[in-house]
């Protein structure tokens, strides 16, 4: 069951709400595909044994939060002929009572009327491995996140908007932005969403029973 509730993001009430529930940023850890925490560490967070940690790179996360609204406004200007863009930081999408998502932006395709999702990302490029992870694909951490957003909102597509940032040879900050659209109708997406949904329900049963799940290791 899908529902929409009013809850201002990042308030004490919102932080309390997410306790024991699975958000988009948790999805990769549920599957053992997170770069930052294991499924067992996530379980410890959900039952209160460990303090919730979003990501360890606090300074970079702070930068991303600072430019998030600017990037969304730029996207809205650049795609004004294609999408209606809005942001609502008082809406949380909930599925089955425990799966939830709060969105960076909400999209409406002007031509078709389809509803979609805007998801912004700031990616710090500190080695060639970062480019390799994004070469013709989406890293697992972010792919799982957008699958979860599609799952919990019932929307038809996501536009992932990663902005890559690095220091160039002159010591100046350089940036490059990509736009990646993922649709429910794309090959394999519905199957991947079903797999994630089943895994999240299984994980939630471990949370409810306070039984530690088997440890899942990320693929090499």
Residue ranges and their predicted role:
Residues 1-220:
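Accessory terminal regions of nucleic-acid processing enzymes
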């Amino acid at each position: 069951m899908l529902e929409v509730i009013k809850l201002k993001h990042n308030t004490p009430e919102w932080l309390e709400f997410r306790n024991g529930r699975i958000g988009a940023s948790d999805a990769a850890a549920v599957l053992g595909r997170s770069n930052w925490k294991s499924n067992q560490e996530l379980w410890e967070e959900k039952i209160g044994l460990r303090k919730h940690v979003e990501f360890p790179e606090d300074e970079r996360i702070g930068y991303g939060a600072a430019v998030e609204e600017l990037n969304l406004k730029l996207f809205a200007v650049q795609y004004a002929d294609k999408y209606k863009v809005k942001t609502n930081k008082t809406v949380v999408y909930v599925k089955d009572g425990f799966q939830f998502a709060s969105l960076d932006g909400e999209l409406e395709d002007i031509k078709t009327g389809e509803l979609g999702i805007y998801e912004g990302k700031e990616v710090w490029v500190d080695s060639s491995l970062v480019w390799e992870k994004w070469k013709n694909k989406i890293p697992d951490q972010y792919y799982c996140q957008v699958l979860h957003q599609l799952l919990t909102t019932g929307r038809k597509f996501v536009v992932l908007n990663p902005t890559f940032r690095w220091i160039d040879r002159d010591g100046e900050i350089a940036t490059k932005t990509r736009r990646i659209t993922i649709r429910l109708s794309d090959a394999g997406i519905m199957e991947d969403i079903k797999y994630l949904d089943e895994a999240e329900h299984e994980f939630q049963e471990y949370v409810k029973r306070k039984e530690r799940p088997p440890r899942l290791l990320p693929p090499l």
